[in-house]
Amino acid sequence: MEREYMEFDVVIVGAGPAGLSAACRLKQKAAEAGQEISVCVVEKGSEVGAHILSGAVFEPRALNELFPDWKELGAPLNTPVTGDDIYVLKSAESATKVPNFFVPKTMHNEGNYIISLGNLCRWLAQQAEGLGVEIYPGFAAQEALIDENGVVRGIVTGDLGVDREGNPKEGYYTPGMELRAKYTLFAEGCRGHIGKQLIKKYNLDSEADAQHYGIGIKEIWDIDPSKHKPGLVVHTAGWPLNDENTGGSFLYHLENNQVFVGLIIDLSYSNPHLSPFDEFQRYKHHPVVKQYLEGGKRVAYGARAICKGGLNSLPKMVFPGGALIGCDLGTLNFAKIKGSHTAMKSGMLAADAIAEALAAGREGGDELSSYVDAFKASWLYDELFRSRNFGAAIHKFGAIGGGAFNFIDQNIFGGKIPVTLHDDKPDYACLKKASEAPKIDYPKPDGKLSFDKLSSVFLSNTNHEEDQPIHLKLADASIPIEKNLPLYDEPAQRYCPAGVYEVVANDDGSKRFQINAQNCVHCKTCDIKDPAQNITWVAPEGTGGPNYPNM
């Protein structure tokens, strides 16, 4: 069909730290060179920051480069880290504090800040607009615009006003637009749905290890002022997880008597009975955590997958007409449990390459090889190289053995131990059969520290237009009940942190798979963990999904 179109020099998909940093850098470079570069950022959330969720302890290295005067410009870095506590939780009641000497160097946070990444992105968007970037929130990029020569020429936004069966709704239908560009950057975050399509189309991961993921579940709490320690960073390993189902937690004291509390569970977990949501709820009852939350009030909830494969899992970064940046590429440094500064730097490097190409008079459609070269020469590459073994060591040797390996690698060899560990088993292939794994009896939520899924999703402010096509696509509708249920007790009903998937009984006693798509918080776990790789997440109508205030 013929669509309306707009033309830009650069289109960027996603207003997160990578996309916004790229946009700002492009405009800075244009101003320095006295040239015009038109830049458009599209964002599927209702506003910039609405879909941003991160810990976040923020390392300001890339921000220092992008805006050296960020303090004067009012960047929301309000709480410097004042202390690091790391515990190994041995059981539901006991814990051992790890002496500072034994903590891997990458886990020290002097000079970093506890922030809301959503608020930092809102600030970055203000800077970008001040530099002349056009930002369009509420518009979901549905697919890449690829010409007959296999060159990416921009993106197509999703149609609006389509009913559940895919038919235009009278008086409401608006076809999506083509946003055409000389170069297109994809900054959709972890497991971006167009990024996934591009990796497959251009075979970008042919020389990479399998990507590995975690699911991060997070809450914001208002706590008793007498328990509040602004700047305190607490991390834990161990209980409620184990060597076959690994992960770790965080509890960060920010300003205004608030804490961020969360649990990250590696999606390589093997027990299909495990529920990341319920593991997080019971984790909050541990004395190390409970001491801060008791008497407080939960005010926000959300979840998001993270890419943690690191350097060994990076796909090829470029293709004709564009590039992947940030978590769409997989630049998170798992040894630091930080991805914001690395995402920003990747966006800045890509922007430099595009500015150089446009200044040389190139018309787009080519591969940005100078982005790849600059990446390999940057501190970002050095950081990812030094942390390349971190996740694989935990997968291979468990939390304790992997922790010992990482201590030696990071603290003695500075991340340059003369061996590279590889982990090429994808996360979805790690599940045991339900009959081979122990069942897990989760305690009922008490409504004070622990809660159910529905009341949690309510706090994410998630909303979707109900009469639209379901954005969670099953390649084969029979697989959930006929294969996943007998083999794995259909893990989707547990791995989803928002209650999207249910196995329900029909009147005749048979089972059916129900998808409550309106609950979806866009975490992407189903797209990653489904053992049959039968679920594909695609973008719903723009503005749909969570509306995180300051996650």
UniProtKB/Swiss-Prot annotation:
Report the residue ranges that make up the 4Fe-4S ferredoxin-type domain in this protein: 511-540
Q: InterPro entries annotated for this entry?
A: 4Fe4S_Fe-S-bd, ETF-QO, ETF-QO/FixC_UQ-bd, ETF-QO/FixX_C, FAD/NAD-bd_sf
Keyword vocabulary terms for this entry: 4Fe-4S, Electron transport, FAD, Flavoprotein, Iron, Iron-sulfur, Metal-binding, Oxidoreductase, Transport, Ubiquinone
Q: Domain of life here?
A: Bacteria
As to how many cofactors bind and how, the note says: Binds 1 [4Fe-4S] cluster.
PROSITE patterns from the xrefs? 4FE4S_FER_2
Q: Which GO biological process categories is it annotated with?
A: electron transport chain
Name the cofactor(s) required for activity, per the record: [4Fe-4S] cluster; FAD
Pfam families according to UniProt: ETFQO_UQ-bd, Fer4_ETF_QO, NAD_binding_8
Gene Ontology MF terms:
4 iron, 4 sulfur cluster binding; electron-transferring-flavoprotein dehydrogenase activity; metal ion binding
Q: Does the keyword Ion transport apply?
A: no
What function is annotated for this protein?
A: Accepts electrons from ETF and reduces ubiquinone.
The entry assigns this protein to a family as follows: Belongs to the ETF-QO/FixC family.
* Listed name of the protein: Electron transfer flavoprotein-ubiquinone oxidoreductase
- Native source species: Pseudomonas aeruginosa (strain ATCC 15692 / DSM 22644 / CIP 104116 / JCM 14847 / LMG 12228 / 1C / PRS 101 / PAO1)
